[in-house]
Amino acid sequence: MKMLIVKLSSLGDVVHTLPVVQDILAAFPTAQVDWVVEKSFAPVLSAVHGLHRIIPCELRRWRKSFWTAATRTEWRAFKNDLQRDRYDAVLDLQGLTKSAVVARLARLSPAGQRFAMANATEGSGFEAPTRWLAHVAIAMTPHVHAVARGRRLAALALGYSHCPYADFGLKIESNVPLAQTFNASGAIKNIANKPTAKTVAFVHGTSRVDKEWPLAHWVALGQRLNAAGFQVALAHGSPREQAISQSIAARLADAVVWPLQPLDEVAGALAHCAGVVGVDSGVSHIAVALDVPHVQLYNVDTAWRTGPDAIASQGRQVSVFAQPAPSVEAVWQAWQAVVATSTG
């Protein structure tokens, strides 16, 4: 059997969909599972166990210049890549017009079908064409976690039952990032810094300002971690985030700033940390998928939809929610509980 997953973006949504691959392979061990995704997120999929083929696209860029010769050439190449195989099932797990169009372009086997969601779920995007262009539109419970939504849709479409807990299937190689370290005078030097059992990564970057945690809170938490014997490592994905990372690191006794690096290398670094503290962002969700001890911070009450499953992780991964933002003390207490659970 050949299956195609269409989940193009964003990073967090792609990560939340990863367990579908393992669910399908558990039900159909000889299945070929392919995935269409935005090119910038493809490095994460390259680390997924059992995924046969990654089909990258750049719809975000192409739609800005579709009528140029270069874009049209790239679009034709993408279509040729997409239509190389005929699929027994095409799963539109995104529920947007763009994903519906991609799913419609995929070729089917004689008995093949396209599946999609029939309705919106709370807090997630949905556009009606996704159900119009599918052979089968599956009704979803409106109040559902992002991970559970994709798993349920695929299971109902393909007729199998999945286990209660999600297996994200990430297989990560060791990674030693070049980092910036700050001494007491504020001078910067580059070092080869392999994360260790005493490294805690901070993931402060997010695409939404209302999800950010105050800079002073990061500094205060970092100081507590330093006092407890932990080094702090700071990730970033843009010049603005890099500046914030450097500002936090400069105020800590033991901190490093990782360089801008591909997502698979970020995942490799996170996998070797003692734990991660991060806001609701794609990189934080990678930490969850890696089963790294994790405290995820929420200024908005959406942890029920995107946060880690504290029960499945046996307390190794938790969410902390408060408005306008979680306090340093609350996050510190959560971290201590996570450490106790992880080392107990």
Regions found by a protein language model. Name each.
Residues M1-G344:
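Catalytic machinery of carbohydrate-active enzymes
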